[in-house]
Amino acid sequence: MEIKEEGTSEEGQHFLPAAQANDPEDIQFTSIQKSPNEPQLEFILACKDLVAPVSDRKLNTVVQVSVIHPVEQTLTRYSSTEIVEGTKDPLFLTGVTFPSDYPIYEETRIKLTVYDVKDKPHDTIRTSVLPEHKDPPPEVARSFLGCASFKVGELLKSKEQLLSLSLRTSDGGKVVGTIEVSLVKMGEIEDGDTDHITTDVQGQKCALVYDSTAPESLSGKENLPFMNAVLRNPVCKLYRFPTSDNKWMRIREQMSESILSFHIPKELISLHIKEDLCRNQELKELGDLSPHWDNLRNNVLSHCDQMVTMYQDILTELSKETGSSFKSSSSKGEKTLEFVPINLHLQRMQVHSPHLKDALYDVITVGAPAAHFQGFKNGGLRKLLHRFETERRNTGYQFIYYSPENTAKAKEVLSSINQLQPLVATHADLLLTSASQHSPDSLRSSLKLLSEKTELFVHAFKDQLVRSALLALYTARPGGILRKPPSPKVSTEEKSSQHDSPQQLRRQDSIPHHSDYDEEEWDRVWANVGKSLNCIIAKVDKLIERDSRNDKSTGGDSSKDGDADPNLEDSLTSHPREDWYEQLHPLILTLKECMAEVVNRAKQSLTFVLLQELAYSLPQCLMLTLRRDIVFSQALAGLVCGFIIKLHTSLHDPGFLQQLHTVGLIVQYEGLLSTYSDEIGMLEDMAVGISDLRKVAFKITEATSNDVLPVLTGRREHYVVEVKLPATVFESLPLQIKEGQLLHVYPVLFNVGINEQQTLAERFGDVSLQESINQENFELVQEYYSIFMEKMPPDYISHFQEQNDLKGLLDNLHQNIQAKKRKNVEIMWLAATICRKLNGIRFTCCKSAKDRTSMSVTLEQCSILRDEHQLHKDFFIRALDCMRREGCRIENVLKNIKCRRYAFNMLQLMAFPKCYRPPEGTYGKADT
């Protein structure tokens, strides 16, 4: 039967068309039995006794792997091994792996084609781009040696799970050697030395917990919806490398997209729209203002309405991206995708070595959070915010100056008001419900909750900012009169007087005293809430006391209470069996009315504070808000993805869970941006975006449906991410987490530029931005370490210190930061090591997370294999080249620019540290 070739160009691991996976004919295929979320099939290759076309030539061998579907008989080029030089018996370190959702069956045929590469540096493009039945074009400089094929079922059912196949020439005649195919199951021990292939294979599930063997339940079906809601389109690679004692270790490399790339930005933009609409409504409800302030308000509202419309348009466009989980580097300048992180992926390395526990290492790779569409002509957020604040403080203008801290405080108090007022009202209603049931125990419980929430409500207004804001609003009223709706319970007279025109206010760091303004009037209004609560407490105490006396009495007179309030006593004696509801209802109404009065005044005054920030340099202020929202959205999407992955892989680690709710998690970002040209602005954006992640907290809840996507709540000053877990998993969590305790993160950023632009910055420019960022974030790491050592249990700390010398690592990191050495990449290595030892979440970022990021994560993976898993020292460079040439990161490049070349040239690479240079033949000019 003729085999038709799938026409492809620059392809990697890709899926057959749906029609092939679901054949229209009713032919039944035999599925491969596997564990959930595990690759369906993995095997490794070796050749023996290859015959060279020319007798004196040493072969440089590569194997191309293709898939032949059993019905369509179409051939799909799938992957290839690395090139092994100078031997007729090549043993390949790069294996072949088929992901869990790849349409492969026992009837599927695998074709293996062996080539001799004559000019390795020019063999840049994977063999999959070549026509299957034709000799390679002359410019590729490689020749066909032989091919063989087998059915998947033959390998699975083979006695030793090993096939030894004869390699034949294209006409099927001459035998040119043998190729051995060995089935691999991660978790098995591969016996024997590294100079030959072994076939002793037994079944075992792979580990999914960092540095420990995964519990069985972690791979169970209850977690499938959880992980499938986060990860998409996995790319898997398989390697085997020798250890220092000549044993084999197996490594599975996986790269997955995340649906959170689009889900989190959409959630966040929806919250921004809701918050901004609420703020605009609050501005409208400020009441009468003098002409100057009223004009400013109208101008602000006009611009803010335009912002809301723009956010709504962006959300509409993003909502059209249904099912999207990836934004390519070539799309980083698209306006409709501004809020979406660039090239976000989970990069995972799973290691099984003969003498150590299975281990898992995760890094989130993502483009540096930055506003690419906005551009970097005037710098990034760090510079723009500083300049904006300096101008507000030092330039004369007709507004009232509030510091960023006071503005943030105003937003915080407004948020507390919006949260606490409905809570107090709810608990007040519950108190009335308990009263109607005439249940003393229920009444006491309801009163306790009402008291707690009301005290929090009252405490929120203690800040001096509220007082100064009330006076500021007073001066902004027509004629300087503070006008307010009448209070139902507390009546006060407002003195009116003429005041100087507000146009005369200039560069005021505080509100001037106004002789006609009654500062104590606010205290009286505010105190009425507490007094109302005290009346309710006293009434409840009397009702319960009276009820207790009635229970003890057999119908006689109640005992005398000389200290009782006469009014309350009259009420009690007039109701032998009191109607508690009727007696408490008026007091509850009073409490609610007093609260409404306080809320009305406070919200108006604090909204006036926010008006000052918006009114000054209005377009610039809103553009800064937009830019900050964009950068934060990109950073938040990556953080949520990293948190969920870390949580999933550590669910059965008691130490991690205790650290999570006791201390929180450190989140370490490795930046590779230069401090030159546009990348300075990107780094300035990134620094602010990562710092803003401190206002994010996580809460874990039990999933009540199959929808386990995280839910975002809050406003710009504070966000809570609700992470849902399946019921069986949720029940195993510590009580503090199950009760909804907020879980905090400590984001830190260390940046070291490594490219040719950084060379220019170091010799002719300025690297102070990088130095400042590294020093500031080192202090944050020290702070986290101190909290960690203080709050974690002594027995845990004792064991932790035995296993890790964190203090030595921190001292070394500090010395390297102070050294001011050019391209000191040891800063990044030390920061990454500290993060891993502290159970943190690792990120690696460059401009687009494609080229420099690929060099960094592959170097990190091989360094871990060397330092933690005894990778043979002679194989370090070869392992590094394997991962960079044939691993997941070259697939990432292909996904982004449709070309399998890292975007470096020879001159650029001369400026790179040697360990960050890709192997020859994998880089060059790419048509993106």
UniProtKB/Swiss-Prot annotation:
Residues 1-23, 481-516, 548-575 are annotated as: Disordered. One of its GO terms (molecular function) is lipid binding. Its EC number is 3.1.3.66. GO terms for cellular component: cytoplasm. Residues 1-13, 506-516, 548-563 have a biased composition (Basic and acidic residues). SUPFAM superfamilies: C2 domain (Calcium/lipid-binding domain, CaLB). PANTHER family: AGAP000124-PA, INOSITOL POLYPHOSPHATE 4-PHOSPHATASE TYPE II. Belongs to the inositol 3,4-bisphosphate 4-phosphatase family. This is Type II inositol 3,4-bisphosphate 4-phosphatase. It comes from Rattus norvegicus.
